[in-house]
From Swiss-Prot:
It holds the Pfam family Epimerase. Keywords: Carbohydrate metabolism, Isomerase, NADP. This is ADP-L-glycero-D-manno-heptose-6-epimerase. GO terms for biological process: ADP-L-glycero-beta-D-manno-heptose biosynthetic process; carbohydrate metabolic process.
């Protein structure tokens, strides 16, 4: 029997594969699209039994090749570019593909865990897994939002089947180097500081001072742990926020990233005020392209996740970014 991870060469998917390996689990079929071939690097230190292109995998399950052979699908594959404007592509890639997998898993009684997104909330100031707080600002968010609505219907119709959706907030950490502009601000800050000796953040917007817009930043190691918790508990279903449960500023991320780099040089840590005074942090104009499409504040309500029994602490920005910078120093 196999465990399938889609998006396995991507950011979160490869961290899940590695977390499974650390448990001694290697009967993993990795599914992805390696058109952007550099992602293969995320799987070099992982153990899997097979790799399939995303389209080949769908064709094979529809042809019955995997009937009775899969225990669980962890569906992380998607286009996660919030700036993508091709709605037809987004809906086919994110929504329709997910629908095929969902219905196959229900038919086969296979555990189905999938990536949703905090983008489903849009500009809502309340981040609770309820329909009245949802209102995506872009087609990426809509593709995730619509699938979540179908999942709610399927859960009501199939109460004994496991379907779990994770509304990821701002995930950062190892194995995201292929993501380009969609990589985390921590990754961009690391690269900026290494190249230019300073980091850049957006000027104030939405009523927030420079760099003080706040997001729920969640370390990818915590994301992988939550996925495996639900894999261990097939009796638990639902759509769950997956963040740290706390909002922290982009300034906090910049301070942690710079100080992580300074630590590697045996230099002392600096405060935000010291970074500004020494010209190590500067602010750039808020992009026109993001106006009306930007979440200036997010903070996951973890009440439902905690009620489901997941009680491990989530890393703070200071803890997680410090670990991440150490990883980047070794691997990039």
């Amino acid at each position: 029997m196999y465990i399938v991870v889609t998006g396995a060469a991507g950011f979160i998917g490869s961290n899940i594969v590695k977390a499974l390996n650390e448990r001694g689990i290697t009967n993993i079929i990795a599914v992805d699209n390696l058109t952007k071939a550099d992602k293969f690097k995320n799987l070099i230190d992982c153990d899997i039994v097979d790799y399939l292109d995303k389209n080949d995998f769908i064709e094979r399950i529809q042809a019955g090749h995997f009937d009775g052979e899969i225990d669980a699908i962890l569906h992380e594959g998607a286009c996660s570019d919030t700036m993508e404007t091709d709605g037809r592509y987004m809906m086919e890639n994110n929504y329709r593909y997910s629908m095929i997998l969902l219905d196959w898993c229900l038919d086969q009684d296979v555990q189905f865990l999938y990536a949703s997104s905090a983008a489903t909330y849009g500009s809502s100031g309340t981040f609770k897994e309820e329909r009245q707080y949802e209102g995506p600002l872009n087609v990426y968010g809509y593709s995730k939002f619509l699938f979540d609505q179908i999942v709610r219907q399927r859960l009501a119709q199939n109460p004994s089947s496991q379907i779990v959706g994770f509304r990821y907030f701002n995930v950062y950490g190892p194995r995201e180097t292929h993501k380009g502009r969609m990589a985390s601000v921590a990754f961009h800050n690391f690269n900026q500081f290494r190249a230019d000796g300073k980091v850049k953040l957006f000027e104030g917007s939405h009523g927030y001072p420079d760099g003080d817009q706040q997001r729920d930043f969640v370390f990818v190691g915590d994301v992988a742990k939550v996925n495996l918790f639900f894999l261990d508990h097939p009796e638990k279903s639902g759509i769950f926020n997956l963040g740290s449960g706390r909002a922290q500023s982009f300034n906090d991320v910049a301070v942690a990233a710079v100080n992580g780099c300074r630590k590697a040089r045996s230099e002392s840590a600096l405060s935000l005020e010291e970074l500004r005074a020494q010209g190590l942090l500067e602010y750039v104009a808020f992009p026109e392209a993001l106006k009306g499409k930007y979440q200036a504040f997010t903070q996951a309500d973890l009440g439902k996740l905690r009620a489901a029994g997941y009680d491990a602490p989530m890393a703070t920005v200071e803890e997680g970014v410090s670990q991440y910078i150490e990883w980047l120093q070794r691997n990039v």
